[in-house]
Amino acid sequence: MEQNSSNLSKRSFELRKLLNRANHAYYVLDTPLMEDTVYDRLYRELLNIEKNHPSLITADSPSQRLGSTPAKEFVKVEHKIPLMSLDNAFNFEELQDWDLRIRKLLNQKNNFGILKTSIDFACELKIDGSALALSYANGVLVQAATRGDGVAGEEITANVKTITSIPLSLDIENPPSWLEVRGEAFLPKQTFDGINLLRKQQREALFANPRNACAGTLRQLDPQIVASRQLDFFAYKMYLPKDWDPQGENIHQPEAQDAALKWLKKAGFKVNPNTKIFKSLHEVQSFFDIWEKKRHKLPYTTDGVVVKVNNFKLQEMLGVTQKSPRWAIALKYPAEEAPTKLINLSYQVGRTGTVTPVAEFEPIPLAGTIVRKATLHNADRLQSLDLHNEDTIVVRKAGEIIPEVVCVLKELRPQNSTRLYLPSNCPECDEKLVRGTDQAATKCVNNLCPAIIQGALRHWVSKKAMNIDGVGSKVIEQLVNKGIVKSIPDLYELNYQMLFGLERMGEKSAHKVIESIEKSKTQPWNKQLYGLGILHIGEGNAKLLANAFASEDELSHAAINSPERIAKIHGIGNEMVESLQEWFEDESNQRIISRLKELGVQLKSTANDSGAIKSVINSSNKEVLGKRFVLTGTMESINRDVAQEMIEKAGGKVNSSISSKTTYLITGSNPGSKLSKAKELGIKIINEEDFFNLLSK
């Protein structure tokens, strides 16, 4: 029997309230209130009520986050308060100039008296996304607009409702009749990478960066597409009616930026947790310096620090110019993109024979370094850029990221320039280059190519592989060019006399090199396997394979005769299995293996090898049993699936988000926001080594 209308109305109200709270907890606080299955069931119940009783649908219902019909076009809307851009400062001196200007103006406004109120500065990370203006009427989101020209923007309410970190209704009693919230919509890095990977698979044009992807997403006419891209949002500014009196609330009209951010957070908005208040410019500069170094570890992109006068009365006294507020300035990070002129196109041949075109250009300062070269990756990239000699190109370098050519400014191309192509012959050995079907890489397949030999040797002696000291690139280059070393096993036949004749190689250095080469014979099996340089077999995968197969003999036999055994290992994909099979079937590689064994290189597990993974995988211990784990960042030796399997087999549980019930947060490189959340909640934080130690107890 159907419930009566008053009961249904009450039930739908309760469901809306609970589901909105659950959304806020999950997407903003990162602390789930309920399991996904519970949420889904309640959500379906609400959908069912609204389907049969459309009059009960409200604007703040979670069901309204997704509009059903794509818009035909966007409507222009005028901002009640202009959405201005900020002036920029590019160094400390320009920040000081801004400080002098605002103090001078405040003293003038104060009739040239001494300003009694000290100036505090609110420092916020400048999120690299798209500015939005959100309008709420009586606590319900009624309009969302882009910045546009600052005076008017485009109305994109249906799209913005799909952003789960933006509340559809304010989580406060007695909401104001009108409220405008300003903030930045952005695309998290991980989501951006996933979108571009999908677009690459579908042969669609890739987005240049998360900012462009965010802007393009917000202008999609179909909210379903916007929802699928999982945008996020940080609120940073609010405008309340001056006569608003929040009766019954402990929230009063904020008088400063830090208080406004607390208000926004209490009202249900996501605010950036890294905002700080400082009393001096030197503190501001220190904050900026810290984040200039740390910014690449954040899960979203930033392009500077916004410095604001914290006190709203002082902001009002300072006012605005025609384009920007006087009370705020953006202290920008060093440029990460810049135009420059192409000088030359050279080619690098890697250890696997892959030929990579490299653009050489006039030096430019980028991200704190002077950049002269940038990789073009492969022939496809070279072709898509349509690169000509003497072109003006745009180069990007973000932090530790390898410089890359973003685009060509064809409007500045010289009239008589000629197009550049990948050579048909290897630039090192002059053998014919080969490109396989559906392969992006163009390769030299000559095993005697000096560049391939040098690359293989550099990889073999590296710290992550055989860790042979004293054999750097210069030594390897001399050994190969003189014909002393033609393959990896030749290293183990070197003697002092062979090394003495090399540049900068004295008797003492030669002795150390011979000792280090001899010592490398007992390196752990996984490092030896990694050192062989098999395509697609990285350091972590080598550990997995070495754990599953105790020797080269076992692995070689499986690769050639029963590759399905290798495919069953978690973390090893079909591409890796095929690569292993191809490598071990190659006669020249088999000769390398045979010679290494003859010369005393183990190529098998020994008693000294770490068996941490093997000893744990089927065990159960009290340190893990019943405990809850969350992972963040990239693990060095294993992937997340393997780590999860290890935890579960040891009796633990893996969750996707941090909550008060979490026992351990396992951190890899480049940890995300979960790290700061864990610190706030006092969760025990461990690294990869701690994790293995925990499992082996």
Swiss-Prot record:
Residues 619-697 form the BRCT domain. The gene is ligA. The active site is at residue 126. Keywords: DNA damage, DNA repair, DNA replication, Ligase, Magnesium, Manganese, Metal-binding, NAD, Zinc. PANTHER family: CHROMOSOME TRANSMISSION FIDELITY FACTOR 18 (PTHR23389), DNA LIGASE (PTHR23389:SF9). SUPFAM superfamilies: BRCT domain, DNA ligase/mRNA capping enzyme, catalytic domain, Nucleic acid-binding proteins, RuvA domain 2-like. Zn(2+) binds at residues 426, 429, 444, 449. DNA ligase that catalyzes the formation of phosphodiester linkages between 5'-phosphoryl and 3'-hydroxyl groups in double-stranded DNA using NAD as a coenzyme and as the energy source for the reaction. It is essential for DNA replication and repair of damaged DNA. NCBIfam families: dnlj (TIGR00575), PRK07956.1 (NF005932). Pfam families: BRCT, DNA_ligase_aden, DNA_ligase_OB, DNA_ligase_ZBD, HHH_2, HHH_5. It comes from Prochlorococcus marinus (strain MIT 9211). InterPro entries: BRCT_dom, BRCT_dom_sf, DisA/LigA_HHH, DNA_ligase, DNA_ligase_AS, DNA_ligase_CS, DNAligase_adenylation, DNAligase_N. Its cofactor is Mg(2+); Mn(2+). Belongs to the NAD-dependent DNA ligase family. LigA subfamily. It catalyses: NAD(+) + (deoxyribonucleotide)n-3'-hydroxyl + 5'-phospho-(deoxyribonucleotide)m = (deoxyribonucleotide)n+m + AMP + beta-nicotinamide D-nucleotide. NAD(+) binds at residues 36-40, 85-86, 124, 147, 184, 308, 332. GO terms for molecular function: DNA ligase (NAD+) activity; metal ion binding. It is an enzyme of class 6 (ligase). One of its GO terms (biological process) is DNA repair. Gene3D superfamilies: 5' to 3' exonuclease, C-terminal subdomain, 6.20.10.30, BRCT domain, DNA ligase/mRNA capping enzyme, Helix hairpin bin, Nucleic acid-binding proteins. This is DNA ligase.
